[in-house]
Amino acid sequence: MALDPVRLEIFKSLYSSVAEEMGITLRRSAFSPNIKERRDYSCAVFNKGGSLIAQGDHMPVHLGSMPMSVQAALQIADPGPGDVIVLNDPYAGGTHLPDVTMVAGVYPEAQARPQPSAARRKRPLFYVANRAHHSDIGGATPGSMGLAEDIYQEGLRIPPVRLMVGGIVNTDLMRLISANVRLPAEREGDLTAQLGAIATGRVRLARRRR
């Protein structure tokens, strides 16, 4: 079956606009100049298999490796409805530790709220993800960008874990992150902005499926 170039361009613009709007939410909600002014962030949309299908006009270094972080999140944490996975692990598709990634599934409206375990195993329609450069993630040097002999000196390394479970923020994990970084209030603000960008992506994709 031949591809219709008109339909292809329509769908490309449709899904790319979701990633762009996620980026707008993130930039306007963030606390740190790294995100608000330097615009050191990226947002993207993935299909139900975790393959990249659309991205915003953001940071190539983020977008090139983000699919590996999404695959790691799906394999290790398997986000269900209302879940958001956070990670910054370079061994799971991350870039450097200050770049924090969030991944979440977009489910049909009937499954958008937390469901019993059988429903949680159903595949989502899409995944949405964003990555943002935090101005500090702990470690020996302010800004987490100093010379280091191993990754443990660089800062807090976060494997794929749930920052939001069934629509509820995991406050224990948020406190753990805040206790290991400089300017914890700013870090919490930027993480919350990333959660807001995820919510924007979910809402926009759900509306486009109606």
Which ranges hold each PLM region?
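N-terminal leader/propeptide and maturation segments of large enzyme subunits in energy/redox metabolism
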Residues: 2-10, 157-210
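Short, basic/aromatic recognition patches
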Residues: 14-38, 74-75, 86-95
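Short, small/polar residue-rich loop motifs at catalytic or cofactor-binding pockets
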Residues: 37-40, 100
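Short, basic, low-complexity termini and linkers enriched in Ser/Thr/Gly/Pro
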Residues: 110-121
